[in-house]
Amino acid sequence: MSSNIPAELKYVASHEWLRLEEDGIITVGITHHAQELLGDIVFVELPEVGANLAAEEQAGVVESVKAASDVYAPIAGEVVAVNEDLPSAPETANSDPYGAGWFFKLKPANVADYDVLLTAEQYAGEVD
């Protein structure tokens, strides 16, 4: 499997990744595959802290020199944090999509929703 799809994360077909943190909060970002398709990212719009998002609801926008794409909430929950550094350094979503390039953090409405998302292996099958 590709090293660009970390095994410890969960994924959705719309190319967002999720990481369940020890405190039960879920960190969300776009995948390496998504940033590769977009090319050089030049603008990021993030959701508002406190927003309650439904699963698959638009949570933000990412724009590159080639295209604009919506970013979706992979599961329902309340936005508890956004990556304050990303709007001023959107290229971080290209250079470190699974680390410093995260987009927002959700307090899931139902943490069990996390368990049914795509594994790294399943997501790899989606993008091959």
From Swiss-Prot:
Cofactor(s) named in the record: (R)-lipoate
InterPro entries documented for this protein: 2-oxoA_DH_lipoyl-BS, Biotin_lipoyl, GCV_H, GCV_H/Fam206, GCV_H_sub, Single_hybrid_motif
A Gene Ontology biological process term: glycine decarboxylation via glycine cleavage system
Cofactor note: Binds 1 lipoyl cofactor covalently.
Alphabetized Gene3D superfamilies for the sequence: 2.40.50.100
Residues modified as N6-lipoyllysine: K66
Chain ranges of the Lipoyl-binding domain: 25-107
Assembly behavior: The glycine cleavage system is composed of four proteins: P, T, L and H.
Record-linked PANTHER family: GLYCINE CLEAVAGE SYSTEM H PROTEIN, GLYCINE CLEAVAGE SYSTEM H PROTEIN-RELATED
Name this protein carries in UniProt: Glycine cleavage system H protein
Organism: Neisseria meningitidis serogroup C / serotype 2a (strain ATCC 700532 / DSM 15464 / FAM18)
